[in-house]
């Protein structure tokens, strides 16, 4: 206490002028960006994010997410030649070293938005190993190959839009004609898939019951259906196209919860009494096996709900992910899975206690392009690990 305050009552000295303990040496000072500095002019994304690490609040979480993603991408284990035959599982880099298996999940609205191009870039360049999406995240990717989505306003009146045949997704507009084009495109594919399925069943009988026995067989699973759509669309703007081309599985356990579900429903009337059958059990075995075989597992979760939990639950099968980055606006006060912080997943064994993890409370369309620019697309060699 300074001499100027030595006449204050003791209660004020104790309450208002309470002394601090010494600050530990490892404390980081809060510091923002000095835009008067020459280095701040036309700053690279990676430099901007690095400067934001000491800013506090969600800016610091964004910086931490970039560090986690860099470590997730750069980790390397043993060379495949050092491993016994039964241990040669999981993902390997081009030089033959073990690397992290990266699971990325995203909700349908992100494909409806311009984030689709960012997600496509990651799949095109094999920067992720498995995807989990909602049904809308599948169909909207295809629909955008057939017709565009437009910018609108959040405030547009629903009744007026309905009268015009315009569907609103936030401040995006999708003409209903787009879904009619989607139906015209997908029904012949369903016809062909049903024909292939029935021919295979007739030929193989009981031997065709296991969808995992022959990954190329027309015993369909949601991921096989999605792969087929990626093959058929044959459009380089599509996430599904690049996932098919690069053999990156896309899992969608709620494949019927969207326009694809409508089309499958309509197709049952056309094809009755036959119908396309999708084996969801084969897909849960596939994604859980990918997790169990991973040398290390990383999660990048864009949004919440089904896509978040499906990846986290797969990582439970290996006693937790090693890296986790969540980006969503969900709050935990209502007990929702979307709102839960990574530490809640630790309690379930879905993220390891010693894992590197962070949650960014933000709109994914704002922060994820910046994260990708600062990490996956920064043009620099991977940090050595």
Swiss-Prot record:
GO cellular component terms attached to this protein's record: cytoplasm
Residues that coordinate or bind spermidine: 139-140, 262, 309, 335-337, 344-350
Binding residues annotated for NAD(+), in chain numbering: 108-112, 134-136, 140, 257, 304, 329-330, 363-364
Pfam families found in the cross-reference section: DS
Transmembrane segments: none
PANTHER family from the UniProt entry: DEOXYHYPUSINE SYNTHASE
Family from the record: Belongs to the deoxyhypusine synthase family.
GO MF, one annotated term: deoxyhypusine synthase activity
Keywords carried by this UniProt record: Hypusine biosynthesis, NAD, Transferase
InterPro entries in the cross-refs: Deoxyhypusine_synthase, Deoxyhypusine_synthase_sf, DHS-like_NAD/FAD-binding_dom
Classification of source organism: Eukaryota, Fungi, Dikarya, Ascomycota, Saccharomycotina
Stretches assigned to coiled coil: none
Active-site residues, record numbering mapped to chain: 350 (nucleophile)
Keyword match Metal-binding: no
Cofactor field: NAD(+)
Functional pathway: Protein modification; eIF5A hypusination
Gene3D superfamilies, alphabetized: Deoxyhypusine synthase (3.40.910.10)
Protein name: Deoxyhypusine synthase
Origin species: Candida glabrata (strain ATCC 2001 / BCRC 20586 / JCM 3761 / NBRC 0622 / NRRL Y-65 / CBS 138) (Yeast)
Listed EC numbers: 2.5.1.46
């Amino acid at each position: 206490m300074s001499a100027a305050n030595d006449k204050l009552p003791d209660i004020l000295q104790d309450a208002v002028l309470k002394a601090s303990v010494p600050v530990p040496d490892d404390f980081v000072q809060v510091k923002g960006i000095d835009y008067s500095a020459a280095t701040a002019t036309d700053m690279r994304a990676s430099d901007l994010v690095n400067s934001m690490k000491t800013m506090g609040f969600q800016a610091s979480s964004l910086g931490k997410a970039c560090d986690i993603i860099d470590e997730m991408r750069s980790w390397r284990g043993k060379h495949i030649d050092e491993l016994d035959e039964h241990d040669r599982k999981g993902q390997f880099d081009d030089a033959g070293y073990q690397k992290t298996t990266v699971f990325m999940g995203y909700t349908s609205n992100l494909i409806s938005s311009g984030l689709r191009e960012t997600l496509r870039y990651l799949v095109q360049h094999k920067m992720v190993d498995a995807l989990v999406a909602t049904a809308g995240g599948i169909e909207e990717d295809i629909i955008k190959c057939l017709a565009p989505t437009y910018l609108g306003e959040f405030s547009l009146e629903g009744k007026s839009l309905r009268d015009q045949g315009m569907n609103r997704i936030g401040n995006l507009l999708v003409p209903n004609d787009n879904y009619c084009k989607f139906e015209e495109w997908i029904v012949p594919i369903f016809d062909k898939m049903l024909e292939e399925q029935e021919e295979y069943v007739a030929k193989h009988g009981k031997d065709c019951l296991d969808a995992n026995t022959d990954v190329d067989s027309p015993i369909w699973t949601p991921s096989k259906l999605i792969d087929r759509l990626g093959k058929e669309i044959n459009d380089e703007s599509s996430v599904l196209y690049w996932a098919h081309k690069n053999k990156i599985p896309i899992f969608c356990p709620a494949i019927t919860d969207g326009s694809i579900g409508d089309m499958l429903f309509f197709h049952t009337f056309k094809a009755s009494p036959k119908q396309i059958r999708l084996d969801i059990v084969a897909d849960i075995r596939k994604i859980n096996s990918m997790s169990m075989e991973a040398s290390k597992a990383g999660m990048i979760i864009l949004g919440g709900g089904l896509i978040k939990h499906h990846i986290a639950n797969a990582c439970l099968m290996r006693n937790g992910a090693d890296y986790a980055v969540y980006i969503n606006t969900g709050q935990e006060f209502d007990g929702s899975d979307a709102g839960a912080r990574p530490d809640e997943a630790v309690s379930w064994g879905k993220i390891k206690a010693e894992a590197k993890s962070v949650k960014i409370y933000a709109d994914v369309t704002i922060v994820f392009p910046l994260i990708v620019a600062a990490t996956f697309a920064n043009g620099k060699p991977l940090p050595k690990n």
